[in-house]
Each structure stands twice: as structure tokens, then as C-alpha cells.
Amino acid sequence: GDVYKRQIRNTLVLAVVATLIGCVIGLLCGILNTIPYTRQDPPVKRFFLKLLRALIRIYVEVFRGTPMVLQAVFIFYGLPYFTDGAVAFRGMSGIWAAAIIVVSINTGAYMAESVRGGIISIDPGQTEGAKAIGMTHFQTMTSVILPQAIRNILPQIGNNYIINVKDTSVMFIIGFTEFFASHRYICLLYTSPSPRDGLLPRM
């Protein structure tokens, strides 16, 4: 019982922390991805914003288009290999750090699109009205657009949290002991997986 309680706590803590960090990542990416530019803007600004949008698009497509278990393997095992040990996750604290990083950046990729969609769903007339009274883009975003956009995407934040609770089960591949991994280990210790016997206690 104590083992299950401890691992359920690990699962919930990982899901909460990673969801919060992922929301911050998604919020930043969503805002940066919707910064407007026109032909009248300096070429450097237009180039920088186009490059930024391209990098965000690559990030979103890669982490939304690949399984989380593959991302976990690459970050936990691949980064130490490719950096010749400069980046390494050692001990339980390292495993926790890797798990949080994996789930956070995965969540951030999904939240980036949710935030972008929430921002562009706001009536453009509100942005034009804010500019007409002399508000800067930053003031318009923080005072007019974001409060409405965040309210619209609150259900998606809840959905991502629920998904993260379930997806933490793939973190066993890097040694993270959450509820699913502990349950599987206990079943292997105390039950027989024989197709004939079913899951029966070992004699």
C-alpha cells in the first residue's frame, strides 16, 4: 500500500510540475509565433520573426509528431552520448530532471498550438481598437488579448494534465518509478502471468 501511495504521488507531482512548465513554454511560443510584422518593418526584424516562427514550427512538429517514449530515450540516453557526457542525468535526481524535461517540452509543443489558436481566435477588431487608442503591441497582448485567450484554452490545459498523468507511465524506460512501473514490478513478484492460470498469486 505504501509503495502504491508513494508512486501515485510521484506520478501526480511529475504531471503537475511538467504541465505548469509546459504551459509556460507553450505561452511563450504561442505569443512569439503571433507577433505581427509588415513589409514596412525593418528587414532585420522581418528576418528574425520569420526565423523564430520556423524554429517554433520545427519544435512543435517534432515533439507532436514523435512518441514521448522516443523523446525520453533520446534525451536521457542520447544527450549524454552526443555531448560526450557533458550533459548527463545521474542518480534519482537526474532521472527526475530528465522526466520533467521530457514531459514539459512535450506539453509545451501542444500548448504552443493551443495558445496560438486562442490568440488568433480573438476578434481582430479588438487589436485594431487597442492600437487606435495608442496601446503598444505588448500592452494589447497583456491587457486585451491574453486574458481572453487564456480563458478560452483553460479546458485544453486540463486535458493536457490528464494526458500527462497517463503518459508518465512511459518514463519507466529511463528508470522513473511511477505507479505503472511499480504495479508491473509487484505483479511480476507476486503473481503468475501464465495464460493458463491467469494472474494468480505465486505459491
Region spans (language model):
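Transmembrane alpha-helices and adjacent helix-loop boundaries
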Residues: 1-192, 196, 202
